Amino acid sequence: MRGVRCPGLLVVCILLSLSGAGTQKAESKNCAKWCPINSKCVSNRSCVCKPGFSSEKELITNPAESCEDINECLLPGFSCGDFAMCKNSEGSYTCVCNLGYKLLSGAESFVNESENTCQASVNTGTTPVPSRIHTVTTAPGNLPEQTTTVHQTQMGDSEERTPKDVNECISGQNHCHQSTHCINKLGGYSCICRQGWKPVPGSPNGPVSTVCEDVDECSSGQHQCHNSTVCKNTVGSYKCHCRPGWKPTSGSLRGPDTICQEPPFPTWTLLPTAHSQTLLRFSVEVQNLLRDFNPATVNYTIQKLIEAVDKLLEDPMETQTQQVAAQLLSNLEQSLRTLAQFLPKGPFTYTSPSNTELSLMVKEQDNKDVTTVHHGQTWMELDWAVTAGAKISENGSSVAGILSSPNMEKLLGNTPLNLEQRRASLEDFYGSPIPSVSLKLLSNINSVFLTNTNTEKLASNVTFKFDFTSVESIEPRHELICAFWKAHNGNGYWDTDGCSMNGTGFCHCNHLTSFAILMAQYHVQDPRLELITKVGLLLSLICLLLCILTFLLVKPIQSSRTMVHLHLCICLFLGSIIFLVGVENEGGEVGLRCRLVAMMLHFCFLAAFCWMALEGVELYFLVVRVFQGQGLSTWQRCLIGYGVPLLIVAISMAVVKMDGYGHATYCWLDFRKQGFLWSFSGPVAFIIFCNAAIFVITVWKLTKKFSEINPNMKKLRKARVLTITAIAQLLVLGCTWGFGLFLFNPHSTWLSYIFTLLNCLQGLFLYVMLCLLNKKVREEYWKWACMVTGSKYTEFNSSTTGTGTSQTRALRSSESGM
């Protein structure tokens, strides 16, 4: 039977041991690493004292607390019994028999009065009778308890009495002051000061009249605290605390062997590719400020740090705004988080001269209340437990802060919005693709930080309310959103993941970073307008190519005017190709490719306008000043046609660097840059105005010339010629582009369609007016057709009537070809 039962019992024992080991392993994973000495963990955030020790609170939630030994001998109602005394030890106690007594069992000690069997070990010939058995303790103090018990035997009446010393310290017959320690001696007693105490001035140390007072080891220099700690006196002793904001490195907390280190401040280094003198001065100023930091002037340091940031943001940032913002916000939050540890508990607010607002709240980590942090621009409500997280500070406090700067928009105002999480639902709602979105900041950018640095997923939501520009009505394709700035690979973008906004303007988020209220304008793609644009541009490119070939190959029409027409068509042709191929910014990020496309479009379209202006100048010299010279030379025309737009692009780059080129939606000019709109609209408006004036003068002069050439011309034919000429000049001189200056409302569908049709078909209009309506061009086309088909070429006799011939000859001098 033993052979059968033993294996089963062995298996059960093994399983039980493994189960216990697994439980201990699971518990160890959830244990707090910071539990103080003489305590054990009960969770990953709390500890309890071991038996025999106690703390101020039942649960220990930060390492600043400690477990002190319980002196069981002083507990009310405690007694070891007759002929015994209590001896306290660290975490426990024992009861031992008085001198001359021993336990019947022969043991050295016991713990309960019920176990007391103390009996006299010396045979005196009499039966000892207990008399005046007293157990007393020392006066209040931090020294271990000392207890002395005296037993006086009383002989029978017939026996001689043997006198024994009376322990006045135990019997209560002493008159020592409560601040002293009673020491019994043969025939008397002394009253002396304990360790950490001293006689008051004028008092002796020993007599009954001795009165003691606590020794302030901290002020007297008798302490052994490390110079990295601060000595704090206690009754009869002292403790060594870390300086505010400093962290312990080794040793027991608040003990003489505690050593602390200064909190590390972030290194405000420049970006490797940044060469801004403003950034360099800012970095040096902040490094010097933090290097010379004095905890006594923490308020001054915080104010100077905020003012330095304001000074940096007031100057326009040339390049790498998102990279600078990522580094600036990270270092600023870390610095403020560290500086806040030196502040006293409670609220702290500061408003700089540039209206940058900082609000800090410093409270105990074990506070469970819902706390509000606010200033003039922002209001935040959060469960205070999330401020510390798993990070425990030595001083037992944590911080929550909000920083709002109106100038932060200069760095993050052009940051794109990430639509990946919501694109499908938005496209389903609008029924069309949404290639991009435009943003407008309605509130200040608010940077929120806590002592807890792991804020990607909080245990409870944080509620915000921002003071932002009120919106009476939200236009179509617009949405009011609560977004946060997310750093990514040195740059960043706006996102809404984890945040929601209700109708009352409150924003709820389960993570923390920098927040703002944005107005998002979704660019919903119009399939019909996109089709018109692509088909129109393809047709325009074909016609512009035919114009270029015609002006190069048809010899009879080559002149100064056809040279202007040639360069005009070349600029429009190149601009249309670049626009068709690269204008859409599918990725949403403004990179080098998008900026180069925007720059080339800027140059090509400005060059087209300049050649349109030269067309007007040619008409002016041709019609108005026909007898006063031949006009501009070829090199002068090229200098104006290509030099002026190149100069405008160069000036634009010098003013805004590359930031003005490229947009999250299209690779075109970013008109949100202050004044950058006029780098294109200014020259366009000026050229259109000048060409319109030239157009009026030209028509007026042509009317007079037609009357002088043929006074008897019929009014109908005269009106027809003037109408054709007017239409040609209107199209060539770019009035279709001028129509776009009046397209103030981008959501006006019919205006968008008209503008798109006029500009996409401009190549077709130019080909019809400059080539097909020109008789010499038609004759050349007919010759080429006959050469291809092998037919014999004949003159167009049907169109050479008398009036038509005279009209053709009259216009030939002007090379109009019509």
UniProtKB/Swiss-Prot annotation:
TM annotation in the entry: 534-554, 563-583, 603-623, 638-658, 680-700, 724-744, 753-773
Topology Extracellular: residue spans: 24-533, 584-602, 659-679, 745-752
Sequence segments annotated as region (GPS): 482-525
Tissue: Although predominantly expressed by cells of the immune system, expressed ubiquitously with particularly high levels of expression in the lung and the thymus gland. In the spleen, expression is detected on most myeloid cells and variable portions of T-cells, B-cells and NK cells. In the bone marrow, expressed in nearly all myeloid cells, whereas little if any expression is found on erythroid cells.
UniProt main location, coarse: membrane
Factors inducing expression: Up-regulated during lymphocyte activation.
GO MF, one example: calcium ion binding
Cytoplasmic side, ranges: 555-562, 624-637, 701-723, 774-818
GO biological process, one term: positive regulation of synapse assembly
Site, as annotated: Cleavage: L512, T513
SUPFAM superfamilies: EGF/Laminin, Family A G protein-coupled receptor-like
Positions with biased composition (Low complexity): 799-808
Location relative to the cell: Cell membrane
Region span, Disordered: 799-818
Glycosylation sites: N44, N112, N227, N299, N395, N461, N502
UniProt superkingdom: Eukaryota
Annotated CDD domains: EGF_CA (cd00054)
Cysteines joined through disulfide linkages: C31-C41, C35-C47, C49-C67, C73-C86, C80-C95, C97-C118, C169-C182, C176-C191, C193-C212, C218-C231, C225-C240, C242-C260, C482-C507, C499-C509
Bilayer topology annotation: Multi-pass membrane protein
Domain GAIN-B: 347-525
Record's comment describing the protein's domains: The first two EGF domains mediate the interaction with DAF. A third tandemly arranged EGF domain is necessary for the structural integrity of the binding region.
Function: Receptor potentially involved in both adhesion and signaling processes early after leukocyte activation. Plays an essential role in leukocyte migration.
This protein's name: Adhesion G protein-coupled receptor E5
Lineage: Eukaryota, Metazoa, Chordata, Craniata, Vertebrata
